[in-house]
């Protein structure tokens, strides 16, 4: 039994996903449109992902001191994935989406992940943009999330630090107000971050024009010290390239790549320090 057949059984016979079409958000869909999406991703997985899974594992990302270099196959797979519109598949039409049920979007991404986890790591961008839709300001959503859903920009989550690992309460990255007018920026209060992040998947590459890092950091108290534990932690939007209020790139930000980590598995995924 193929993975495609297994997904069909799970979606149709067990979950009865076509019943979701009775909801207003998914009213334009049917079992046929669900199958069409799965067929597209199945073909993409077989043609652009699976044949190059071993290649990207052998030709690991490398840093030449200025940029991260990836195999051409990774670039082509990413471009093909963006062309399907799957980055915004579950979003409303307002965000360029298909208004697919999340269940169908997830099933389609399973096909790609099984073909090559390394190449399909760009799905992290969707999670980044979804967080901005849930917690970002309207301007932040328009400037950052929209570009991520279109595939022009990518996204990451930056939690781990060299001295803390993934122990959230032990992070020490600081975020200090940037000038007297730091609250006047139309994209939100502006801070300068000082610290180191480690093991960041897709932390740097040339697949997209920009990378939107969501960085966990602490704002110092009045005495300049950091609050122990998880209290005082905030989340900051830190783009690789600075942008203006209209989303135009204005120059390089102070995000510095120190190097790449060697991975035991999924070696085709960029993992940064």
Where are these regions (language model features)?
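Amphipathic, small/basic residue-rich leader segments at the start of a protein or domain
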Residues: 1-119, 139, 143
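Internal maturation/activation junctions in enzymes
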Residues: 61, 124-125, 136-183
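Structured core elements
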Residues: 80, 88-90, 156-158, 172-176, ...
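FAD-binding core of FAD-dependent oxidoreductases
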Residues: 91, 96-99, 103-106, 115-132, ...
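C-terminal structured domain segments across diverse proteins
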Residues: 133, 158-159, 169, 187-188, ...
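Short Gly/Pro-enriched turn/cap motifs at secondary-structure boundaries
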Residues: 163-166, 204-206, 227, 262-270
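A short core secondary-structure module
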Residues: 188-248, 252
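Flexible, small-/acidic-enriched active-site or ligand-binding loops
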Residues: 244-273
């Amino acid at each position: 039994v193929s993975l495609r057949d297994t997904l069909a059984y799970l979606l149709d016979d067990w979950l009865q996903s076509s019943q979701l079409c009775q909801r207003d958000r998914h009213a334009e869909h049917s079992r046929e449109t669900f199958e069409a999406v799965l067929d597209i991703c199945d073909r993409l997985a077989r043609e652009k992902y699976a044949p190059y899974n071993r290649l990207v594992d052998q030709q690991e990302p490398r840093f030449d001191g200025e940029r991260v270099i990836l195999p051409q196959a990774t670039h082509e797979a990413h471009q093909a994935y963006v062309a399907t519109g799957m980055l915004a598949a579950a979003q409303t039409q307002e965000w360029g989406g298909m208004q697919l049920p999340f269940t169908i979007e997830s099933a389609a991404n399973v096909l790609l992940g099984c073909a090559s986890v390394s190449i399909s790591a760009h799905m992290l961008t969707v999670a980044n943009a979804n967080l901005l839709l849930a917690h970002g300001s309207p301007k932040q959503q328009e400037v950052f999330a929209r570009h991520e859903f279109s595939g022009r920009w990518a996204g990451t989550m930056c939690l781990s630090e060299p001295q803390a690992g993934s122990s959230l309460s032990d992070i020490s990255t600081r975020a200090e107000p940037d000038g007297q007018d730091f609250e006047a920026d139309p994209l939100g209060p502006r801070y300068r971050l000082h610290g180191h992040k480690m093991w960041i998947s897709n932390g740097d590459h040339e697949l997209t024009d920009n990378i939107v890092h969501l960085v966990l950091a602490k704002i110092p108290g009045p005495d300049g010290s950091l609050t122990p534990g998880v209290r005082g932690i905030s989340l900051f939007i830190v783009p690789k390239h600075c942008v203006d209020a209209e989303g135009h790139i204005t120059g390089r930000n102070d995000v510095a790549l120190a190097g790449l980590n060697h991975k035991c598995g999924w070696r085709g995924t960029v993992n940064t320090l």
